[in-house]
């Protein structure tokens, strides 16, 4: 989750989020290099009166400022396109989770084993325990196995919602009458927090998401206990 005074991205908990962070750093490095170059050129123009004194035409410099941006755009576009295809790729899932957005809570369905359904509401501030997180904790967490391919299907029952967990690099719109899907791979245990990221009404900020990532054997025990 995002902690106090955290100015960067959240720590990743999935390979896709790691790739997103790498691309962010890659693009930021290119932007810093461009900023330094432009700043240096502006400094030279301001404080050197003779740099262009005999410049009548500049075919070479025009070639440079045409070709160089094209090369820079390629260095940004190729990793970006690769990442876009990786984000859309659906691998063979071990578990499928269905998430349905409502005003203003989430409901979940596990249908791979037998039908397990539950609603997940935000815990009000006056009912929070001392170690709870305000506006982020829920009464029923989503339990998912770590080191497994997870597919999530997202839809909505009323208005457009968006199921978002930043640590996993996942953001899927939930649209009434439409079923959207994506996949992710959780590579460490823990609690991962998210929120609805599409303005959906008065209590939009009161429908958080909590994923509890557990080892596979604990997940099987949880499924078995819910079956019984």
Swiss-Prot record:
Residues 49-62 are mitochondrial matrix. It catalyses: 4 Fe(II)-[cytochrome c] + O2 + 8 H(+)(in) = 4 Fe(III)-[cytochrome c] + 2 H2O + 4 H(+)(out). SUPFAM superfamilies: Cupredoxins, Cytochrome c oxidase subunit II-like, transmembrane region. InterPro entries: CcO_II, CcO_II-like_C, CcO_II_C, Copper_CuA, Cupredoxin, Cyt_c_oxidase_su2, Cyt_c_oxidase_su2_TM_dom, Cyt_c_oxidase_su2_TM_sf. GO terms for biological process: ATP synthesis coupled electron transport. Changing residue 218 to N: In strain: 14021-0251.0. It is found in: Mitochondrion inner membrane. Mg(2+) binds at residue 198. It is an enzyme of class 7 (translocase). Changing residue 25 to A: In strain: 14021-0251.0. Keywords: Copper, Electron transport, Magnesium, Membrane, Metal-binding, Mitochondrion, Mitochondrion inner membrane, Respiratory chain, Translocase, Transmembrane, Transmembrane helix, Transport. Binds a dinuclear copper A center per subunit. Residues 1-26, 83-228 are mitochondrial intermembrane. It is a multi-pass membrane protein. It holds the Pfam family COX2_TM. Its cofactor is Cu cation. Component of the cytochrome c oxidase (complex IV, CIV), a multisubunit enzyme composed of a catalytic core of 3 subunits and several supernumerary subunits. The complex exists as a monomer or a dimer and forms supercomplexes (SCs) in the inner mitochondrial membrane with ubiquinol-cytochrome c oxidoreductase (cytochrome b-c1 complex, complex III, CIII). Belongs to the cytochrome c oxidase subunit 2 family. Component of the cytochrome c oxidase, the last enzyme in the mitochondrial electron transport chain which drives oxidative phosphorylation. The respiratory chain contains 3 multisubunit complexes succinate dehydrogenase (complex II, CII), ubiquinol-cytochrome c oxidoreductase (cytochrome b-c1 complex, complex III, CIII) and cytochrome c oxidase (complex IV, CIV), that cooperate to transfer electrons derived from NADH and succinate to molecular oxygen, creating an electrochemical gradient over the inner membrane that drives transmembrane transport and the ATP synthase. This is Cytochrome c oxidase subunit 2. It comes from Drosophila simulans (Fruit fly). The gene is mt:CoII.
